């Protein structure tokens, strides 16, 4: 679940939900007028923008919703922003118009080639770098495996990288330890210390392993709740 836009005057927050497990499926089935008991956020530390003149932001899947406020905020701060948006297929593309209206350049990628260019976000990033594009920083937002490879490419080209992590969060205060990640050999809590970390310091293998902790439970709950409610309303 990712909040990507807020309006302080109207008192509204726009949220994009991808139906994965029990909770997100139930959220996707809410109707106009339904209520959520509590909504907590934002958590962690603000993203840094000091000293940046040109950045590439790489978003994967629903991670593009998290990338959106960062991209817009950087552009408003006078930073040149190239946005690379990646999706598995055309049916789950989100926020293209919003990105095009708010940043300098947008590159749309789909794994199967049904929309934009065919290929992965890493393919486009490497193509831009090989063509001579220079960036002060590369930011990755999305699935852990994608962020791992994006940050690896940045390191290969000698460019600083930042990964915006989205781990399991339970209490949002650092007490439960569910969002723990190893950064530079030390434990950090994404909800308090993050979500942004130096991509070259993240223990990616452990992060990916921890991200699969509830995969079996999610699959079981998804099947169960779909049987009870008659299916998932939408994919995102």
Tell where the protein language model's regions lie, with residue ranges.
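Short Fe-S-cluster ligation motifs
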Residues: 189-193, 197-236
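FNR/FR-type flavoprotein reductase catalytic core
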Residues: 22-170
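Short alpha-helix boundary/capping motifs
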Residues: 102, 181-182, 204, 219
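Short secondary-structure transition/capping segments
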Residues: 36, 90-92, 130-136, 161, ...
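Short acidic, glycine/serine/threonine-rich loops at helix termini
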Residues: 151, 174, 202-203
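A short, compositionally biased micro-patch
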Residues: 6-8, 20, 50, 174, ...
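Local cysteine-cluster metal-coordination motifs and their immediate loop/turn environment
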Residues: 64-66, 144-145, 166-196, 224-232
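Ferredoxin-reductase
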Residues: 1-32
